């Protein structure tokens, strides 16, 4: 019963068309599922990932057109990263970001890896991290039809940063699900405590969480450009049910078992209020669509299929068809 690393991140957008264009045409990720938020079917839920949307490669977005801008603060997932294969790939991305007008930093080193910090069009704080020296959870396989050459393509999710007021509480929750402390690095803001690097299972960039203590910030307000939750990988339904018992014994309120069709989940908030999810690796995104046309049409799980007509009527048009 082991957490294996990061499964996916789910963030917020107010512009589903602009989001689709940036993540597919600029970052070169594959849209592997166009579906809806199962808790609010008036909103799209887009999944981007590697060629097949393997667990550990998925960056997802809920679309809420009227949502305000995210306000940075504590109790937030304040930084998300995407893995690329090599230091050479970072050089390619600097040129690509310049070409496409993406706000970005020079290549630098952070927590033992070379990295480029950048923002998406709605201000989400992202980075590209090089897997040049990575040891641990392996990455995925870039889609061969991406506009980005496969040798430079994004291969998965890298370390995430949690910004909190009481780091010991978040660290305790991470330890409960199997994380251990790897290292501490100096704070990015003068006068703040060191950032604690936590890892799980095989470790490496696909299994790392960075806990940033900040005593100088107000609580976050979630909006476009913000991250809603992080999910961690587990093997199957049996393990998920066992984790529900662990959380119950620890006195952590949780959702219990949730059927998401493409995977199974449970949700809980760690003591600083950040939403965590445990999600199974399967069944996967090719359960209801052929591999060749993943993400090209609106996919609905069987328990929403009888509502398709009304759901489609309430969604904004979004053309994601590639095989024309």
Where do the language-model regions lie?
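Conserved donor-binding loop and adjoining core beta-sheet/short helix segment
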Residues: 33-38, 48-82
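Core segments of cupin and vicinal oxygen chelate
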Residues: 12-55, 99, 107-119, 162-208, ...
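Surface-exposed interaction/gating patches
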Residues: 151-254, 270
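Vicinal oxygen chelate
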Residues: 5-14, 35, 66-165, 183-211, 250-324, ...
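Short amphipathic beta-strand starts and helix->beta connectors
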Residues: 62-66, 142-146, 212-217
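Short amphipathic alpha-helices in soluble, non-transmembrane regions
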Residues: 25, 61-62, 94-97, 175, ...
């Amino acid at each position: 019963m082991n957490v294996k690393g990061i499964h996916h991140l789910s963030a917020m957008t107010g512009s589903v068309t602009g989001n689709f264009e940036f993540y597919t045409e600029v970052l070169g990720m594959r849209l592997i599922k166009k579906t809806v938020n199962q808790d609010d079917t008036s909103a799209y839920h887009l999944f981007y990932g590697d060629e097949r949307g393997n667990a550990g490669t998925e960056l997802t977005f809920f679309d809420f057109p009227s949502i305000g801008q995210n306000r940075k603060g504590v109790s937030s997932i304040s930084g998300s990263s995407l893995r690329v294969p090599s230091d050479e790939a970072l050089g390619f991305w600097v040129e690509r970001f310049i070409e496409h007008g993406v706000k970005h930093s020079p290549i630098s080193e952070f927590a033992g890896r070379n990295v480029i910090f950048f923002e998406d069009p709605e201000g989400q704080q992202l980075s590209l991290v090089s897997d040049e020296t990575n040891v641990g959870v392996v990455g995925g396989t870039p889609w061969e039809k991406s506009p980005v050459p496969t040798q430079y393509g994004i291969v998965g999710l890298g370390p995430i940063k949690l910004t909190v007021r009481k780091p010991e509480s978040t660290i305790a929750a991470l330890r409960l699900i199997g994380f251990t402390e790897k290292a501490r690095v100096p704070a990015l803001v003068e006068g703040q405590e060191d950032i604690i690097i936590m890892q799980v299972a095989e470790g490496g960039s696909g299994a790392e969480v960075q806990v940033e203590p900040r005593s100088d910030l107000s609580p976050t307000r979630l909006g476009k450009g913000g991250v809603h939750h992080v999910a961690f990988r587990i093997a199957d339904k049996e393990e998920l049910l066992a984790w529900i018992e662990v959380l119950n014994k620890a006195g952590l309120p949780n959702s219990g078992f949730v059927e998401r069709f493409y995977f199974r989940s449970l949700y809980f908030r760690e003591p600083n209020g950040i939403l965590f999810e445990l999600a199974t690796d399967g069944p996967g995104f090719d359960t209801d669509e052929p591999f060749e046309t993943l993400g090209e049409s609106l996919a609905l799980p069987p328990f929403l299929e009888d509502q398709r007509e009304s759901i489609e009527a309430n969604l904004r048009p979004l053309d994601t068809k590639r095989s024309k």
